[in-house]
Amino acid sequence: MFRIAKNLVRTFEQSVQDTLALSQDSSNLDAFFQSIPPNLLSAQLESPVDAVSEGVKHTNVNETLSGLRIVWVDEMQFQLQSFFDYIVGFNDDPVPVVSNQHGFSYPDYRRITSIFNEHCGRTLKVNIWSAKGGTFRDEYISIISKESDDLDDVSLNHDERRPSSGEAHQFQALGFKVQWTPLIASTFTYHILNVNIPDGPAQSAGLIPDEDYIIGCQDGLLATGGETLLQDIVRSRANYDLVLYVYNKVSDCVRPITVHIGPDGRLGCNVGYGFLHRIPTVKHCPQQAQQQGQDDNPVPVPVPVESETAFVPSAFTAPPVPTKKKSKNKKGTQPLAMDDYFNEGRDKSSTAAKSAESDILAPPPQKQSSSD
């Protein structure tokens, strides 16, 4: 049995190592990004990223693959999520990009603006890749045209030496802001495994094991990622407060917490980093779960009060207990009372008949008295 268990563990470790090696291979696309259709990545994969810049050869596809990351959304914009969503295409076409002399790709904002201008008064299909489990989806965004009074002013002092900033926006604000960011940046997360210091900084701040993921830090200190980066930052903030941004996979929300680091420079919890500790796919939508919970526990609709027991909850599914007792008493006592009533009637009739017979037999003594 021990040998079988040892072989199973060895096989599992080998499969994990193969998966990690495949994800770290510069020539293969990371498994986290394979949900994106290949046609949306062709513009970046075919760009001259192999160009040599200052003696460094950029050949890692996973590090250079980028998208328009959502960094801010309006409170009325429910289709997109900041930090997690990346725009990787429009109308099933890749994001227009251009390459500089060093082989790096960046968005062609002039072409992107023209795409939005062409769809004024219509909906635009936006291809979204999410860092929550590496999923892909499509969203349709309504492009509202600007009023004639709201059009952008064109500067008359045009300097030919300065490049044009692009076409004028003929559409209203979209309700979100983007930044050209590598997709791999969304994997720089630290999974809370357990709390190892009672009443330590992690426990005092409310970190939840297995559910929480540290996805950011104040001043963008975790933006570059790295297995030991969080540990180094915590040590450098000994005796100071540190603001962390934590994602909870159960509630599907991000919350900021302030952790007071002690003099020992420890956070008080074990964290996991890497391929096995990335943010998983959301199992359910919080709004749908809330609606489902409301459906499971329906609130009774108020009805006019008809009796003293009308306030009992769920009266429409099961009769109230007091009503049952009263009905039992009525069923149990009324028949007995009626039986007694009829029995009493029967007894009276029989006694009356007997008394009548006794009255008929009574005359003989009267005859004797008359003879005397």
From Swiss-Prot:
Compartments (UniProt record): Cytoplasm; Golgi apparatus, cis-Golgi network membrane
GO MF: protein-containing complex binding
One of the GO BP terms on file: endoplasmic reticulum to Golgi vesicle-mediated transport
Domain PDZ GRASP-type: 66-183, 188-276
List of residues that carry Phosphoserine: 155
Region: GRASP, residue numbers: 66-292
A matching Pfam family: GRASP55_65
PROSITE patterns, per the entry: PDZ_GRASP
GO cellular component: cis-Golgi network; cis-Golgi network membrane; COPII vesicles tethering complex; cytoplasm; cytosol; Golgi apparatus; Golgi membrane
Record PTM: N-terminal acetylation; by N-terminal acetyltransferase NatC.
Main location as per UniProt: cytoplasm
InterPro entries listed in its UniProt record: GRASP55_65, GRASP_PDZ, PDZ_sf
UniProt keyword list: Acetylation, Cytoplasm, ER-Golgi transport, Golgi apparatus, Membrane, Phosphoprotein, Repeat, Transport
Region (Disordered): 312-372
Membrane protein topology class: Peripheral membrane protein
Residues recorded with modification N-acetylmethionine: 1
Function: Involved in the spindle assembly checkpoint. Involved in ER to Golgi vesicle-mediated transport by either facilitating USO1-dependent and -independent tethering or increasing target accuracy of fusion events of COPII-coated vesicles.
Note: Present with 2730 molecules/cell in log phase SD medium.
Quaternary structure (record): Homodimer. Interacts with BUG1 (via C-terminus), probably forming a heterooligomer consisting of a GRH1 dimer and a BUG1 dimer. Interacts with COPII coat components SEC23, SEC24, SFB2 and SFB3.
Protein name (Swiss-Prot/TrEMBL): GRASP65 homolog protein 1
Gene: GRH1
